[in-house]
Amino acid sequence: MSDKTPPPTVWPTLRANDARALIRFLVDVVGFEETAVYGETDVVHHAELSWPLGGGIMLGSVRDDAADGPTPAGQCSAYIVVDEPDALCARVRAGGANVVVDLHDTDYGSRDFAIRDPEGNRWYFGTYRGAPRAS
């Protein structure tokens, strides 16, 4: 049976001083899946990483020649839904991630934690899936 889930239509984007190292961190430590990486040597022109539960991010190397001007590294913040935050928190700690908000239960029923990646971006993980959509 084929998956009828529509592809994501909102993609958080970020820039990195060392995009290849950030990709390795997000894939090997956090659990993103590498979907596409385009570039030469140390420069990543475009990369897409998918999250196993849906959605994804796009990223690339910091570039001074961007049409809209340079975007500094470390300016992204994202919330990512996870089914097992305790297991993920243990995994990222073991992988050397900088946990900046310890695992905790929120007053709105989620179990959350947060890390800062090597580029300075903040990643929040938790069980809150958002408010239900109006029908």
Language model segments and positions:
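Vicinal oxygen chelate
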Residues: M1-T13, I23-R116, G126-S135
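Short, surface-exposed ligand-recognition loops at beta-strand->loop->(often short) alpha-helix junctions
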Residues: L14-D18
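C-terminal catalytic core of tyrosine-transesterase DNA break-rejoin enzymes
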Residues: E119
